UniProtKB/Swiss-Prot annotation:
It is an enzyme of class 6 (ligase). Its EC number is 6.3.2.2. Keywords: ATP-binding, Ligase, Nucleotide-binding. This is Putative glutamate--cysteine ligase 2. It holds the Pfam family GCS2. One of its GO terms (molecular function) is ATP binding. It comes from Herpetosiphon aurantiacus (strain ATCC 23779 / DSM 785 / 114-95). Belongs to the glutamate--cysteine ligase type 2 family. YbdK subfamily. The keyword Ligase applies. Gene3D superfamilies: 3.30.590.20. Coiled coil: none annotated. GO terms for biological process: modified amino acid biosynthetic process. It catalyses: L-cysteine + L-glutamate + ATP = gamma-L-glutamyl-L-cysteine + ADP + phosphate + H(+). InterPro entries: GCL_type2/YbdK_subfam, GCS2, Gln_synth/guanido_kin_cat_dom, YbdK.
Amino acid sequence: MEYRDPGHPHFPFTIGIEEEYQIIDPETRELKSYITQILDEGQLILREQMKPEMHQSIVEVGTHVCRTVEEARAEIIRLRGAIGSLAASKGLRIAAAGTHPFSSWQKQDIYPHERYYGVIEEMQEAARRLLIFGMHVHIGMPDNETCIEIMNVARYFLPHLLALSTSSPFWMGRKTGFQSYRSIIFTNFPRTGIPDTFQSYAEFEQYINILLKTHSIDNGKKVWWDARPHPMFGTLEVRICDIATKVDEAIMIAGLVQAIFVKIYSLFRQNQTFRVYSRALINENKWRAARYGMGGKLIDFGRREELSAHDLMAELREFVDDVVDDLGSRAAVDYIDQVLKHGTSAERQLRTYEETGDIKAVVDQLIRETMEGVPLDQATQVVSG
């Protein structure tokens, strides 16, 4: 079955990952608005794989199209190595977390580009304070109709992915009480959150065209749902996750997303169905995932009862179990065991803060974990070559 075989020439469910890193001053541990000083040099190395974001203390990278999670792992290691080494050559560091533990959005410079000036003009304070860092996973689709059908079903699993990825418990020096405060901040933007269901791709296009005609948006990329059909790449893009701190965590998430989509498609091919739940119900789980992460309970809508996030994660693994070997992603998905044992990034950050009482120690931990598994000799080689 070509749709479950990454080695098949027509395998559709390819992987692409975007990550947004923090640029850190290692002396103060504050964010550093420095992208303009390293962008030209970085793009000589990475070309279009490195981009600025609205705030100059953010650097965005994107992998090439990958067929397997192990290809994606090599790409993420290469990109983190390149950006990390480039930052180090300027006396800086990078870190991966959904928010910075204490830096203020009010002290960040905006990247000088009309696109970002336009966003700020429209969104005002909601845009200026959008100092958050995400991970987006793109999965290739066989066709547009299949993309919509998979999105309708996969919406149910978005809170599961958020709970696993939580890495933003702090905001401007305060414990927020949330495991993903990033997801709370992003709700200030329009056209965010769990997407609605669509009966067809034509209905989705009609929605986009209404927004364009009424000047609500000027392009389809300004629909920022937690999952969306990408307007240019032909992918289904999952946007709900905080950026993963460790490489292993990023690959775990990417492997899960790919496996979920392939399993849903497999059910379609066998004329089987999976119930499509309302946005109102899924939003209940999203809020719980943001608030409690893997330490709380989510709702099993089929049973109509609460289950621990750990138990629902076991159900998710059982759901994708018959496709992960074909996809070569069992080891990546099994990393969930390590997250359950040692905690999510958010849980580890909070534990470090509780043990040390020093929020700068949290930044140091994030810097270390971001580059964990990235060989320094490889990082240097990428930058110099």
